[in-house]
């Protein structure tokens, strides 16, 4: 059964890739990712305390195909209405981007230094990061992403786009400064999400078809992935163990603690943004996004995006796939014509690329709103010039 599902995912991905000629097309990403997850499960199946059953595989297949069809239909309908619009390429004046970027970097470094000064460095970088992470879990209002992440992400994307049309010493210096802030942001944020969002955004904006940048991308992914998993985490075990923990275990946990039966420790964060908003208005306390660890042959506290949906009802999962697929298709199509949408979509890709890991489409509504506002504000200062 599992090989049939993998085959369907791969065939669907290749059909969509043939039609759209873009590896970042939503349906292509989702189908390839779930094919890789299931292949990873087959390679490491002896590690788990539970095995994937046919009901779970059928559920995954139906949800992924629902997302795919919603994306294709919505994007195709939109394309019929705007296909006569030229896919104009715009150049953002790099000098203006550098000025805005330096201002953002300056404020970011001041904030980072203030935050880091609140913690006493321990015996290792790992213990230092754990101290910061524990403080953020207890007090989510102190989380770095809540303050600076949307601004830095927007500035980074604008810089990458403007850098496509310039190659100056100023650009190289600015790249170094952005990288330094980025590394400190990882240490302060102690999360993986910002790392992958930046990597995906860079790959989408630059274009993986450019060989030189593709090599840089693969190198960056390899270095960051190895650094995070082997050095910062310091966990025992080989590559199969890490593959299991970060790629496959969420689906196993979803099946055992949500899909087959809802455990006592289960919860849903699909409406977390609205719950937190109501908490701010009424003075209440919102639920933490951190879920409890469970044992599936190894420890994990992520349960795929589907867990947040099926906790309420299985029907909600299909509805969310329709909504998510439609929005993703629209954004992909509009990103071909508008820089602002291209920048937003470069980060929105994360929502469907990591469905197998956790829910970020609904729970990160606040971030999507903040990034949108940042793009709107920056667009008032940065006037793009049509060059083709």
UniProtKB/Swiss-Prot annotation:
Record's keyword annotation contains Acetylation: no
GO cellular component, one term: plasma membrane
Keyword annotations from UniProtKB, A to Z: Cell inner membrane, Cell membrane, Membrane, Transmembrane, Transmembrane helix
Subcellular location: Cell inner membrane
Major location (coarse): membrane
KW Cell inner membrane (keyword) present: yes
Membrane topology reported for the UniProt record: Multi-pass membrane protein
GO BP: any one term: lipopolysaccharide biosynthetic process
Entry's transmembrane regions: 23-43, 57-77, 97-117, 143-163, 180-200, 215-235, 312-332, 338-358, 361-381
Function summary: May function in vitro as a polymerase that catalyzes the polymerization of the O-antigen repeat units on the periplasmic face of the inner membrane, leading to the formation of the lipid-linked O-antigen molecule. However, E.coli K12 strains do not normally produce the O-antigen in vivo due to mutations in the rfb gene cluster. K12 strains are phenotypically rough, their lipopolysaccharide having a complete core structure, but no O-antigen.
Entry protein name: Putative O-antigen polymerase
Organism: Escherichia coli (strain K12)
